[in-house]
Amino acid sequence: MTMIAWMQHFLETDETKLIYWLTFLMVCMVVDTVLGVLFAKLNPNIKFSSFKIKTGVLIKVSEMILALLAVPFAVPFPAGLPLLYTVYTALCVSEIYSIFGHLRLVDDKSDFLEILENFFKRTSGKNKEDK
């Protein structure tokens, strides 16, 4: 019973929950980067580029810095923590989606603007030739 109480101690405050979200986000970022580099090296169809690796790492570091800097601004406000949890959840989902894209479990080559354009074409019933 003392072990359960000890584990519950880590979830008593919102600050510790934020630390767990940030840790999970960092783990997802590391796994995504390692898988991206590994698959780029192993796949002969993909040109291995150190510039792409540097760009990806720079983006991940900047996302983590922004996630850390958001904490002191969000905590004093009543709606700050739910907003922060939402942002952290969105970042984690984005990283997990990228990991699934590396593993070819999802189609990561979809063009969002093309999907929106097709949706509006179907709803309006007009084509580009109708203009």
Swiss-Prot record:
Chain ranges on the Cytoplasmic side, renumbered to this chain: 1-52, 102-131
NCBIfam families: holin_tox_secr
GO biological process, one term: killing of cells of another organism
InterPro entries in UniProt: Phage_holin_4_1
Lineage: superkingdom: Viruses
Subcellular location: Host cell inner membrane
Listed Pfam families: Phage_holin_4_1
Organism encoding this protein: Bacillus phage PZA (Bacteriophage PZA)
Family listed: Belongs to the bacteriophage holin family. phi29likevirus holin subfamily.
Kinase as UniProt keyword: no
Name of the gene this protein is made from: 14
UniProt free text on domains: Isoform Holin has 3 transmembrane regions whereas isoform Antiholin lacks the first transmembrane region.
Keyword Oxidoreductase: no
Protein name as annotated: Antiholin
Keywords: Cytolysis, Host cell inner membrane, Host cell lysis by virus, Host cell membrane, Host membrane, Late protein, Membrane, Transmembrane, Transmembrane helix, Viral release from host cell
Chain segments annotated as transmembrane: 53-75, 79-101
GO cellular component, one term: membrane
Membrane topology according to the record: Multi-pass membrane protein
